[in-house]
From Swiss-Prot:
SS bond partners: none
Gene Ontology CC terms: cytoplasm
The name this protein goes by in its record: Galactose-1-phosphate uridylyltransferase
Gene expressing this chain: galT
Catalytic activity: alpha-D-galactose 1-phosphate + UDP-alpha-D-glucose = alpha-D-glucose 1-phosphate + UDP-alpha-D-galactose
EC number: 2.7.7.12
Associated pathway: Carbohydrate metabolism; galactose metabolism
Family named by the database record: Belongs to the galactose-1-phosphate uridylyltransferase type 2 family.
Organism: Lactococcus lactis subsp. lactis (strain IL1403)
Keyword Cytoplasm part of the UniProt annotation: yes
Length: 493
């Protein structure tokens, strides 16, 4: 197919998406020719030969590279700017989204999600590179992902970033100002990035899909203001308010304290999606009564972390009950279990990771109790993956991991292959950090070429299960569960 046919097919997508009107076609063509380093044209078929936007993207990027128009280390920025040619303006997308919303919330989100994939805002090809498997436990099936989707910066891009003058705009990667931002240095390319303007409880928010999605329709609800994360009654109201508008999605928040929180605490945001996580499938271990809230059902979830599940048709009472539990947890200590609400200097150590959904006509809130205390033995966190597990997972246990989906570092793809060679007594370059674990596996398992890969994955699953147990404040044993019931009594008194 000729380069001009590729360009014409790309323009056809812009027309189809409503990015341009028919009268804009010649103008759009000339802008695109210049962008690709071309100054000529040959007539081609108006009817598209290729309709896959990502194949066309590859073809046009090849043209740009041939014409030397992409500067060293600028591939990511140029690619996003190219896809911006077929991405409708924010006003057009918002108008179409809310028009489709009149049919149903599902129609609106499906429109936006499909468009985000087509214009490569959601990087579907990169996401398919992830390695995924599961691990069956007494709590249900945990999910494990080795995250390969986010490409490593090449040396040229790193060198180019060092030469860029520091900028405070946008203030962070979650600010609304990223929409359409070309990108510079260590600030990612967002030319083709679009955000839906949403009102939640009278506040302005933005709804976008995550470029490197960890689960189906992984989306982010971000505050229009650059302000810190905070778990409080307002947060519970926001989660439940979002469900009123998008009942087919779940939504949750990272905790708002270091160690137990996510990677971005400086910008208020939540994560949502059309996905049932392992924790959502977990049943109640035992139902309990909240004396002050007769309209709210409550129970302890059968999960390695310490989770209370609240359920009610009454959204107001549900939010009040969650707030009461949060306030009680923020002042509760049990030093026999190393649970300590405050430091001597008054610093708070307790918060909650909340997750909301609608199930069988009722609002449901899972409240995961978190404690970010440290000690001499556990300087990274008492309720954080312990050092023996750091060879697999040492990062914070955020919202997604809490719900039973491990996001493991890309290094494990090659490192685990070397572990397999070691277990088969083959020549290997296994990292020393895996040696104690691998030696333990060797003592307990017989390995063959046919079974070693699956057995190592199973062992990784066991590590993730232990990671969640380490993060649990009331351990799943007799002493820990006794402590959990003492906390419930404290809540009710």
């Amino acid at each position: 197919m000729s380069i001009y046919q590729s360009i014409q097919d790309f323009i056809s997508l812009a027309l189809q998406n409503g990015t341009i009107e028919p009268l804009d076609e010649l103008y759009h063509r000339n802008q695109l020719l210049h962008f690709l380093g071309l100054n000529d044209w040959a007539e081609v078929d108006k009817e598209a030969h290729e309709k896959d936007s990502l194949i066309l993207m590859d073809q046009l990027l090849a043209i740009a590279n041939e014409n030397n128009v992409i500067e060293k280390g600028q591939d990511e920025f140029y690619e996003a700017a190219l896809m911006n040619f077929i991405t409708p303006r924010p006003s057009k997308i918002n108008q179409d989204f809310w028009e489709k919303y009149k049919t149903s919330p599902d129609a609106a989100t499906q429109y936006f999600y499909e468009l985000a994939q087509q214009v490569n805002q959601v990087k579907t090809r990169d996401i398919t590179r992830n390695i995924a498997f599961s691990h069956l436990t007494k709590y249900g099936k945990l999910e494990i992902t080795i995250n390969l989707s986010k490409p490593e910066k090449d040396p040229k891009a790193i060198a180019a970033a060092k030469l860029v003058k520091a900028s405070s705009y946008p203030a962070c990667q979650l600010c609304l100002e990223n929409e359409g931002f070309y990108g510079i240095g260590n600030k990612p390319a967002r030319s083709n990035h679009r955000i839906i303007q949403v009102s939640i409880n009278g506040e302005d928010w933005g709804f976008q899909y995550s470029p490197y999605a960890y689960f189906n329709e992984h989306s982010i609800l971000l505050n229009a203001k650059h302000q810190p994360m905070e778990i409080n009654k307002r947060a519970f109201d926001n989660l439940l308010g979002f469900l009123d508008q998008f009942p087919d999605y779940m939504i949750g928040s990272n905790a708002d304290l270091p160690i137990v929180g996510g990677s971005i605490l400086t910008h208020d945001h939540y994560q949502a999606g059309r996905y049932e996580f392992p924790m959502a499938k977990a049943e109640l271990r035992e139902e309990i009564k909240l004396q002050q809230f007769p309209e709210v059902s409550c129970g302890i979830v059968n999960w390695p972390m310490s989770v209370l599940r609240l359920s009610s048709k009454n959204q107001v009472e549900l939010s009040k009950a969650a707030d009461e539990l949060l306030k009680k947890w923020q002042v509760y200590s049990d030093e026999s279990l190393q649970i300590k609400a405050k430091s001597a200097d008054g610093k708070l150590h307790h918060t909650i990771t909340p997750i909301a959904r609608i199930r069988e006509g009722k609002y449901e809130l899972d409240l995961v109790l978190r404690d970010n205390n440290t000690s001499e033995i556990y300087p990274d966190g008492i309720f954080h993956p312990h050092p023996a597990l750091h060879h697999i997972k040492k990062e914070n246990i955020g919202l997604i991991e809490v719900m039973g989906l491990a996001i493991l570092p890309a290094r494990l793809k090659t490192e685990l292959l070397e572990v397999e060679k070691y277990l088969l007594n083959q020549e290997n370059e296994m990292s020393e950090i895996h040696k104690p674990w691998a030696e333990e596996l060797k003592e307990t398992e017989y390995f063959s070429k046919e079974t070693v890969h699956e057995t190592v994955q199973e062992a990784v699953g066991e590590v993730f299960e232990q990671v969640l147990k380490d993060a649990g404040v009331f351990k799943d044993n007799e002493v820990g569960q006794k402590g959990f019931y003492e906390f419930i009594n404290f809540v009710n008194n």
